[in-house]
Amino acid sequence: MNILELSEQEVVRRNSLEQLRNLGIDPYPAAEYTVNAYSAEIKRNFNGDENVAKRQVSIAGRIMSRRIMGKATFMELQDAEGRIQIYITRDDICPGEDKEFYNTVVKKCTDIGDFIGVKGYVFRTQMGEISVHVQEMTFLSKAIRPLPVVKEKDGEVFDGFTDPEQRYRQRYVDLVVNSHVKDIFLKRTMVFNSMRSFFNECGYIEVDTPVLQSIPGGAAARPFITHHNALDIPLYLRIANELYLKRLIVGGFDGVYEFSRNFRNEGMDRTHNPEFTAMEIYVAYKDYNWMMNFTEQMLERICMDVLGTTQMKVGGKLIDFKAPYKRVTMIEAIHEHTGIDISGMNEAELRQVCDKLGVEHNETMGKGKLIDEIFGEKCEKNYIQPTFITDYPKEMSPLTKEHRTNPELTERFELMVNGKELANAYSELNDPIDQRERFEEQLKLSEKGDDEAMYIDNDFIRALEYGMPPTSGMGIGMDRLVMLLTGQESIQEVLLFPQMKPEKVAPRDTKEKFAVCGVPEEWVPVLHKAGYLTVQSMREDKPGKVMQQLMDINKKYKLGLAGLNLETVSAWQEAPYE
């Protein structure tokens, strides 16, 4: 890499890297470094009794701050549990006559961001801070790019690494400098573990189903399409795993569940990412009433396991997952929030309702989609506390069993929390003839232009023809659940690496383009370093200013390039250029 492409800090760090190697120190050793203690545990178990032998520890981590005070140096080391101060004195770490390790390695070659391992004893400083007195130090990894230095004073943060786009692109930096971010993802793991434990205690089996599918079934969504070269067939990234899990119920499992990575080629916003994690569970011999009770119990248990309470604040709103939850039919919900009773309405009448309410719609939408748009626009946002919206119209639910008392409805519920859907569940349709008819209705919607209509899966129908017991299934958006339990209002905050637009790169002319103006090849990187990334930007400044900046860089970095004069720079700027 050209030295001019580096910042001053990066140049200094690379010089330190070279100096370490010249001293015979490997800045990236391969050998295992034994760790027997961690920062939080050391502080928690410290015994300050002077009569007790000082505890010997071996810890490792990243340097987050350092203060050099002549023959002594204080550093703050960050490990998996937190941070702890370490204290290094010249004579303790270099007990002999040779003090070069302290004077050169500790004082000059260590930087914030470096990984080191230290061995020593635990003590309390005169200021009362529990620390490690270092007797031995090992370099584990040299950081050649500086971390953002976040400062804090009296509870106020300065120079914070807070720009959302930068944080999401460089999550590895975000995790290092913003400690609360790591806490979010630790809680995410706790949520998954708690849910998995709850299911396992019930005797249900965790399974894996295909991510690449020949038919993208189980949800109304637009799929990502790819191609299998060996088989020469199109394949789709999974939009849902529902139909495969139901096949397993046909095969004799009483209860199966899966945490699945799903992919939907649709919009991105604060609650949607094209790649997301869902959990789906299917239990034989149950119905949607049982599943509502089960879902309440599960969520209450998870909240207690992760937070120790069922209450949490999200955007200033207090949400309580304590069971039981309110239950409202979809027809009742629409009537409550619009004053219109849509029960029994046909497609034309629903379009009139949309027009009256100002709900956007188009000719590709069937009856179910129109009802969904009305509910989404006028009702959904009002359900802040956990609420089951039940008994959806049949047209909205092609995989759901017909309601036992009303043939126009289905036995389906969605759990609404904080104005968004969190979970979706059915009494599953197990009549193969009815299922085929529902798929054929979806095909008609597809022919009208609805690109979210479901595909016909003939193999799934064949599985149903062998017989599937009465079953209830439930799917839950894990990312949204984690958002709620960690008080986040954007899905990007609970995804380690959310999908992002390509990073913007400033336009930069090549050496060949500068050569057209007579700029020698060796001066092009210098122009770039000075901020003249294009010929046009070079032409916009006065020749004297351009020349002075180039000569300053030439001198500062000891490039040894031949001197410039005003006439030469003026000639570059005035040369014809297309």
From Swiss-Prot:
Ligand binding (Mg(2+) 2): 421
Enzyme class, first EC level, given as a word: ligase
InterPro entries: Aa-tRNA-synt_II, aa-tRNA-synth_II, aa-tRNA-synth_II/BPL/LPL, Lys-tRNA-ligase_II, Lys-tRNA-ligase_II_N, Lys-tRNA-synth_II_C, NA-bd_OB-fold, NA-bd_OB_tRNA
Keyword DNA repair appears in the UniProt entry: no
Keywords annotated in UniProt: Aminoacyl-tRNA synthetase, ATP-binding, Cytoplasm, Ligase, Magnesium, Metal-binding, Nucleotide-binding, Protein biosynthesis
A GO cellular component entry from the record: cytosol
Cofactor: Mg(2+)
E.C. designation(s): 6.1.1.6
Binding site for Mg(2+) 1: 414, 421
Keyword Transmembrane helix: no
Any matching Pfam family: tRNA-synt_2
GO molecular function: ATP binding; lysine-tRNA ligase activity; magnesium ion binding; tRNA binding
Catalytically driven reaction(s): tRNA(Lys) + L-lysine + ATP = L-lysyl-tRNA(Lys) + AMP + diphosphate
Cofactor notes: Binds 3 Mg(2+) ions per subunit.
Subcellular location: Cytoplasm
Coiled-coil region list: none
Subunit structure: Homodimer.
Family membership: Belongs to the class-II aminoacyl-tRNA synthetase family.
Name of the molecule in the record: Lysine--tRNA ligase
